[in-house]
Regions:
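Glycine- and acidic
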Residues: 40-46, 76-80, 225-229, 243-244, ...
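C-terminal non-catalytic alpha-helical accessory regions
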Residues: 229-266
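Long, His/Glu/Asp-enriched segments that create or flank divalent metal/ion-associated functional microenvironments
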Residues: 127-208
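Peripheral, non-catalytic segments that deliver or gate enzyme domains
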Residues: 209-211, 252
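Hydrophobic alpha-helical and helix-loop surface patches within well-folded domains
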Residues: 1-152
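Solvent-exposed, flexible loop/coil residues
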Residues: 38, 42, 89, 183, ...
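Edge strands and adjacent loops of beta-rich recognition modules
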Residues: 211-227
Length: 266
């Protein structure tokens, strides 16, 4: 509502700082799920922190951007109407949003509606978040996910990641693609999925900056992005690029030298 009323305030750029704060806490071993069982009133008070608020808001914004604002609003309206003057549980909201996705898919002829409950149950009831490692060349892109932690871990948790891509293709301009990644590794054919006969000039993962996950690129895709940082990335995408890179240095995924090379282009 605030963004639609005052878009010049760029509220989601400002929220990027809050999301980054939640990501830092969520990368600790001491993190907790957004929703936890409460057996005593004192335990409820303990839940009011950056995870329940900022991460909670982040995953809602993530699904909002993935399914689309209009579909999200339809789901919220149906949820409020169905449960007015009543009590609800968490899954009631996800079911309402999923029904809205099913209706939107039927109207548009889309084969598969977004499985909102599957996505949100994982993000709400599982502590932590993933890092998406992007590598490849002009022909193929490989995405790998794993839990993001500042300290090494044997955790093999997989998330259903709502991935939003933005690609700049020679002769075609900007091409956008959204997909749900549930596998540990996924390889995408560039020509088939993005560029066609055109040359891939730049690739941005987590386009729009709404995803609650880290992204790190190999040297090939980093070089494409940094050829024109201001032209290729929005404000929040530039912030996420630097913030994710520094977090990956702290986690031992990226070297300090690579980070310094990155920030020199700004």
């Amino acid at each position: 509502c605030l963004h639609n009323w005052k878009p010049e305030w760029e509220i989601w750029n400002d929220f990027g700082l809050s999301r980054a704060a939640a990501s830092r806490v969520d990368a600790l071993k001491s993190t907790h799920p957004i929703e936890c069982p409460v057996n005593h009133p004192d335990e409820a008070a303990e839940m009011f922190d950056v995870i329940s608020y900022e991460k909670g808001c982040s995953v809602l914004y993530q699904i909002h951007e993935f399914i689309g604002g209009e579909t999200f609003r339809r789901g919220i309206a149906a949820y409020l109407k169905k449960h007015s003057y009543g009590n609800t549980e968490t899954h009631d909201l996800w079911d309402a949003l999923e029904e809205a996705c099913q209706k939107a898919a039927a109207e548009s002829g889309k084969a598969e509606p977004e499985p909102v409950r599957l996505i949100m149950d994982k993000w709400v009831f599982t502590p932590g978040h993933p890092v998406l490692e992007v590598s490849g060349d002009k022909c193929a892109i490989t995405f790998k996910q794993r839990p993001f932690k500042f300290l090494s871990t044997d955790d093999k948790t997989l998330w259903p990641i709502p991935v939003c891509l933005k690609a700049r293709v020679k002769g075609k301009g900007l091409v956008e693609k959204r997909f749900l990644m549930q596998e540990a590794q996924l390889t995408m054919d560039v020509a088939k999925e993005l560029s066609g006969d055109g040359e891939l000039e730049c690739l941005v993962v987590n386009a729009g900056g709404s995803g609650f996950y880290r992204v790190t690129y190999d040297k090939h895709f980093t070089s494409l992005i940094t050829k024109d940082v201001n032209g290729n990335l929005s404000t929040i995408e530039r912030f996420n690029l630097v913030n994710d890179a520094w977090a990956c240095v702290r986690a031992g995924i990226l070297s300090a030298a690579d980070y310094l090379n990155l920030i020199q282009v700004f």
